[in-house]
From Swiss-Prot:
Keywords: Calcium, Cell outer membrane, Membrane, Plasmid, Virulence. SUPFAM superfamilies: Type III secretion system domain (SSF140591). It is found in: Cell outer membrane. It comes from Yersinia enterocolitica. This is Outer membrane protein YopN. One of its GO terms (biological process) is protein secretion by the type III secretion system.
Length: 293
C-alpha cells in the first residue's frame, strides 16, 4: 500500500473501497485504488485538494465575468453599428441640415473642455438639435473625427459611451426619427408645416399612441399656424407604408387603429369646415335670404 501526503493526481477520481465509512472518518483517512494500486490519502491531502478546487473555481468565475463583460460590450457596439447603418441610410436622402458645421463646433468645444462629463455632452447635443436621430448622427461624426486625434483619446471614449447610452435608451426613437425624415423634410418644404413637429407627431403615433383625442390635441398644439389637413395626410401615408411592411399581428393592429382614427379626424375636419363655411354665410346674411339674429 502506498501512502500519499499532500499529493494530487489532477482530475482522476479515487474509488472508495469502503462506502459505508462515515464522512467524518473519511476526513482523517481515505482508502482507494489508483491505477490498480492501493493508496491511502491522509488528512492533509484532502484539504490541499479542496483548496485547489476552490482556487480553480475562483479563477473560472473571474474569467467568466470578464468574458461576460466583453460580450456585453461587443453586443452594445454591434447595436450601435446597426443603428448607425440605418440612420445613415435614411438621412443620406436629405441635405446635411448643418451636420458638418455642428460636428465641427462640438469638436472645438470638446477640445477646450477636457473634463466634460457624459451628461454635459448630452446637453450640448440637445442644444444643437432636439431630434434624437440627428444627435446620434453628430456623435458618430465626433467619434470619427476623434479617431485621428490620439491626444483626445479620453474624449473618444466618452463619445463612444454616449453612443452606447443613446442606443440603450432611445434606439426606437432614433431609428423612427431617421426613417421619417425624408418624407417629413419634403412636407416641410412648403414652409407651412415645420420639420421637427412632423417627426415628433409621427414618432408619437408609432411609439405611444394615446387615442384620437390626444392626437387631435397634439396636432393643434404642434401646428397652430400649419395645415393640419396636410399633416393628417402625411401621417396616413407614412403609417400606411409602415403597415404594409409590418409582419407582427399586434403591431399591425396598433397601426390600423391610428390610421382609422386619422381618417375620422379627416372627416371631422371636413364637416367642421362645412359648418364654419355655412355659419360664415349665415352670419353675412346671404344664405337663402336668411338674416342673422
Amino acid at each position: 500500500m502506498t501512502t500519499l501526503h499532500n499529493l494530487s493526481y489532477g482530475n482522476t477520481p479515487l474509488r472508495n473501497e469502503h462506502p459505508e465509512i462515515a464522512s467524518s472518518q473519511i476526513v482523517n483517512q481515505t482508502l482507494g485504488q489508483f491505477r490498480g494500486e492501493s493508496v491511502q490519502i491522509v488528512s492533509g491531502t484532502l484539504q490541499s485538494i479542496a483548496d485547489m478546487a476552490e482556487e480553480v473555481t475562483f479563477v473560472f468565475s473571474e474569467r467568466k465575468e470578464l468574458s461576460l463583460d466583453k460580450r456585453k460590450l461587443s453586443d452594445s457596439q454591434a447595436r450601435v453599428s446597426d443603428v448607425e447603418e440605418q440612420v445613415n441610410q435614411y438621412l443620406s436622402k436629405v441635405p446635411e441640415l448643418k451636420q458638418k458645421q455642428n460636428v465641427s463646433e462640438l469638436l472645438s468645444l470638446l477640445s477646450n473642455s477636457p473634463n466634460i462629463s457624459l451628461s454635459q455632452l448630452k446637453a450640448y447635443l440637445e442644444g444643437k438639435s432636439e431630434e434624437p436621430s440627428e444627435q446620434f448622427k453628430m456623435l458618430c461624426g465626433l467619434r470619427d473625427a476623434l479617431k485621428g486625434r490620439p491626444e483626445l483619446a479620453h474624449l473618444l471614449h466618452l463619445v463612444e459611451q454616449a453612443l452606447v447610452s443613446m442606443v440603450e435608451e432611445q434606439e426606437e426613437a432614433i431609428v423612427l426619427g431617421a426613417r421619417i425624415t425624408p418624407e417629413a423634410y419634403r412636407e416641410s418644404q412648403s414652409g407651412v408645416n415645420p420639420l421637427q413637429p412632423l417627426r415628433d407627431t409621427y414618432r408619437d403615433a408609432v411609439m405611444g399612441y394615446q387615442g384620437i383625442n390626444a392626437i387631435w390635441s397634439d396636432l393643434q398644439k404642434r401646428f397652430p399656424n400649419g395645415d393640419i389637413d396636410s399633416v393628417i395626410l402625411f401621417l396616413q401615408k407614412a403609417l400606411s407604408a409602415d403597415l404594409q411592411s409590418q409582419q407582427s399581428g399586434s403591431e399591425r393592429e396598433k397601426l390600423e387603429i391610428v390610421i382609422s382614427d386619422l381618417q375620422k379626424l379627416k372627416e371631422f375636419r371636413s364637416v367642421s369646415d362645412q359648418v364654419k363655411g355655412f355659419w360664415q354665410l349665415f352670419s353675412e346674411g346671404i344664405t337663402n335670404g336668411l338674416r342673422p339674429f
